[in-house]
Regions:
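Secretory/periplasmic and organellar redox-cofactor proteins
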Residues: 1-3, 79, 88-97
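Rhodanese-like catalytic fold shared by cysteine-dependent sulfurtransferases
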Residues: 2-83, 102-105, 111-152, 158-219
Length: 219
């Protein structure tokens, strides 16, 4: 990454890798190709957005116990997988007011409360957490959702990789995770059913539904 002139954050853990990288498009593509050459990372997915300036000041690589801190020893998300819901399917469900089986769709925001305050889907549930590790403790508050269609979502889909399987393991029957998160939804569906902006963790601060930066750093 450094040799390619990229800046950003790379998080490494036993459960995988999560990277936010910025630089010339060709350099990012080259690094992505190199990562996918590792047999463990062949299915690595990337979400792209463009910025007028580099939104990171340096390259930071960190090894962590968890990519997203849940603090649930023994929990294995692979034991209770939750399907990914394509953005276009979610929009169709929201347009119709129900899923393909006629069931009400409940949107559950898995982000921190201050992120939700900046923007979220209309009518989404806000668990009111200040850090993701509190999410599990809120599940009992939503026992009435166990027999309803729940779609979890977060910025890029990473937190939902744990939140949705955790809900499945807790007895929520029909739980999805929004594929690619909010940013992928913006890319495919624009701002339909969305209110406000979406917080991102770089110098842009937040993105509008057209993926333009609230703070672009160009002036």
């Amino acid at each position: 990454c450094a040799a390619a002139g990229l800046k950003g954050t790379v998080l490494l853990a036993h459960e995988g890798i999560n990277a936010f990288l910025a630089g010339p498009e060709s350099a990012v593509a080259t690094v992505l190709e190199q990562l996918r050459s590792d047999p463990r990372l062949t299915a690595l997915k990337a979400k792209w957005s463009w910025s007028a300036t580099l939104p990171f000041k340096r390259l930071w690589v960190r090894v962590k116990p968890e990519i997203v801190t849940l603090r649930r020893p023994g929990f294995d998300r692979r034991a209770s997988p939750a399907p990914q819901l394509p953005p276009e399917t979610l929009r169709r469900w929201l347009d119709a007011g129900h899923d393909d089986d006629g069931r009400e769709v409940v949107l559950l925001d898995t982000r921190n409360a201050w992120e939700v305050a900046v923007g979220s889907f209309a009518g989404a549930i806000d668990p009111g957490i200040s850090r993701f590790s509190q999410f599990a403790s809120r599940l009992d508050d939503y026992a009435d959702l166990r027999d309803r269609t729940v779609v979890t979502f977060c910025t890029g889909g990473i937190r939902c990789e744990k939140a949705a399987p955790l809900m499945k393991a807790a007895g929520f029957d029909t739980v999805y995770q929004l594929e690619g998160g909010i940013l992928r939804y913006f890319e495919v569906c624009g701002g339909a059913h969305w209110r406000g902006d979406c917080v991102v963790f770089d110098d842009r601060q937040a993105l509008r539904p057209d993926l333009s930066a609230v703070v672009d750093g160009s002036s």
